[in-house]
Amino acid sequence: MRVRRDKNLEKILDVDPLVISKFPFKLKQDTIIELGSGKGTMISALALKNPSQNYLCVERDRTIASKAIEKFNDLNLKNINLIVSDIQHLTEIIENKVNTIWLTFSDPWPKNRHEHRRLTYKTFLDLYKKFLSPQGVIKLKTDNDKFFHYSLESMSEFGMKILYQTNDLHNSIKNLDNEMTDYEKKWSSLGKSINYLEASF
């Protein structure tokens, strides 16, 4: 669902110290990145639970990013930053490699002509490879079964290793440390099981 722009709310992005605006930005290797972080529900919960861990959100929609910053400030988080950007530009604006990349409930772009927009299409995988450390892991959650199977195939064809996969995250061992996104809460409340995978290059 499209979010109505709120230009007054978006002004926070120009002044808040949690927003990264000077590039290139040097990441610490232990930084955990969430790409397409939305309102930051999952990553803020992780940051609150792990105060010594560094987190970075990447969200291109300015109004949604503003809502995430409001949430981070309400929780008084100091171990999280946000970049407002399209994912395609990441290698131009960040330096160093990280150990964990989260893809959470990405747009599945179901039409074949939009395959190149899927965040697990080969061009995106090539992008992630450039800033993921050799021992790094990509973690993906989605309610969309077709997108999940597509992602498994795309990653395998790219030469990635599937380290773990399940079609029912909430009834798996991985749920012990799981924090839910807004979409995850919505779909799981309706009885939809959540797909999850971990993969490396």
Curated annotation (Swiss-Prot):
InterPro entries, per database record: SAM-dependent_MTases_sf, tRNA_(Gua-N-7)_MeTrfase_Trmb, tRNA_methyltr_TrmB_bact
Domain of life per record: Bacteria
Assigned EC number: 2.1.1.33
Any Pfam family the entry gives: Methyltransf_4
Entry keyword Repeat: no
Reaction catalyzed: guanosine(46) in tRNA + S-adenosyl-L-methionine = N(7)-methylguanosine(46) in tRNA + S-adenosyl-L-homocysteine
Gene3D superfamilies membership: Vaccinia Virus protein VP39
Pathway of action: tRNA modification; N(7)-methylguanine-tRNA biosynthesis
UniProtKB keywords: Methyltransferase, S-adenosyl-L-methionine, Transferase, tRNA processing
Active site as annotated: D107
Residues noted as binding substrate in the record, renumbered to the chain: K111, D143, T181, D182, Y183, E184
Binding site for S-adenosyl-L-methionine: E34, E59, D86, D107
Keyword tRNA processing assigned: yes
Purpose: Catalyzes the formation of N(7)-methylguanine at position 46 (m7G46) in tRNA.
Family membership noted in the UniProt record: Belongs to the class I-like SAM-binding methyltransferase superfamily. TrmB family.
NCBIfam families: PRK00121.2-2, tRNA (guanosine(46)-N7)-methyltransferase TrmB
Name of this chain's protein: tRNA (guanine-N(7)-)-methyltransferase
Native source organism of the sequence: Mycoplasma mobile (strain ATCC 43663 / 163K / NCTC 11711) (Mesomycoplasma mobile)
Gene name linked to the record: trmB
